[in-house]
């Protein structure tokens, strides 16, 4: 038997805890998911990161990134190497991810202090819908526990932006940063500045594109796109502004290759349009079309970490 608690009920039972954000993003086409957690403290986030990585389950990678704990996983169920923390077992882990309509069910295991994390901390985060507990649930001490945490099904949307400035005024990275911060739809995840080919003849100065990513409900994507388009339209100083839109957790390899090559190769707009069409990227002309190369490249480079911000010579 189980019992169910809402976040406010968990908070009332255990007192206020530390989880500031908890998002479950899914990419059902590729059978993968990503769990993003914002924690108030560096210590518990780092401990959870290494233990979840060691415990395996459905996790394929766990890392700290941009102040967030990011967990890549496969949709389904996996075997846990779970127990007191030591070389071959971890004290906290994710056993299963299931998509149930508009919700995602994640099954967590924790022991001792880690049971508090999965039983009291995450479940009281406002991003959680409800948590299901077994009747014999106990946390802390030496207790081992498991729970099912149910959250809204979210998807990742990347919005690339280029050519919003002139030699007199403007900065594309500022436009996209403001757009992400002020967007009322979804949750802002990351902001990137993507270095393009410094030898591009039509550059402003540094020749950079930019992009932001969001966690959003699928039915809210049209509203997100509408907000981004109109925000950029009001903020741009250029007649050649383009935004691009990509949904998913896996940027296609051909799109990544194009993005990287834009750091050293000079392309025509039609090249970028073709790559976009072949790889599921929506291109939106805001005030023109010359910005399409950078806006497509920004999506391609989005998951490259520091490499997105540099030129190839920086990494030789």
Name each model feature, range by range.
Residues 1-316:
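Conserved mixed alpha/beta catalytic, RNA-binding, or beta-rich assembly cores of soluble enzyme
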């Amino acid at each position: 038997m189980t019992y169910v608690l809402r976040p406010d009920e968990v908070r009332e039972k255990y007192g206020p805890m530390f989880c500031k954000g908890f998002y479950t993003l899914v990419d059902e086409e590729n059978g993968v998911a990503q769990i993003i957690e914002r924690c108030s403290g560096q210590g518990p986030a780092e401990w959870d990161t290494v233990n979840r990585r060691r415990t395996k389950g459905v996790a394929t990678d766990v890392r700290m990134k941009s102040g967030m704990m990011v967990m890549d996983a496969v949709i389904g169920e996996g075997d846990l190497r779970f127990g007191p923390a030591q070389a071959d077992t971890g004290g906290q882990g994710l056993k299963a991810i299931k998509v149930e309509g508009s919700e995602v069910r994640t099954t967590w295991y924790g022991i001792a202090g880690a049971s508090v994390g999965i039983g009291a901390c995450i479940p009281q985060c406002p991003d959680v819908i409800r948590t299901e507990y077994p009747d014999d649930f106990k946390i802390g001490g030496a207790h081992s526990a498991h729970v099912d945490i149910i959250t809204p099904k979210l998807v990742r949307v990347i919005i690339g932006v280029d050519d919003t400035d002139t030699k007199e005024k403007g900065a594309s990275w500022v436009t996209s940063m403001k757009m992400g911060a002020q967007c009322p739809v979804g949750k802002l995840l990351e902001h990137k500045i993507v270095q393009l080919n410094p030898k591009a003849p039509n550059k402003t100065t540094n020749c950079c594109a930019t992009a932001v990513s969001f966690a959003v409900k699928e039915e809210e994507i049209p509203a997100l796109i509408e907000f981004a388009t109109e925000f950029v339209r009001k903020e741009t100083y250029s007649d050649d502004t383009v935004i691009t839109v990509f949904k998913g957790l896996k940027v296609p390899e051909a799109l990544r290759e194009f993005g990287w090559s834009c750091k050293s190769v000079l392309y025509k707009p039609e090249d970028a349009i073709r790559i976009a069409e072949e790889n599921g990227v929506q291109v939106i002309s805001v005030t023109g079309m010359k910005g399409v190369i950078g806006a497509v490249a920004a999506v391609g480079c989005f998951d490259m970490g520091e490499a997105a911000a540099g030129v190839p010579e920086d990494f030789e």
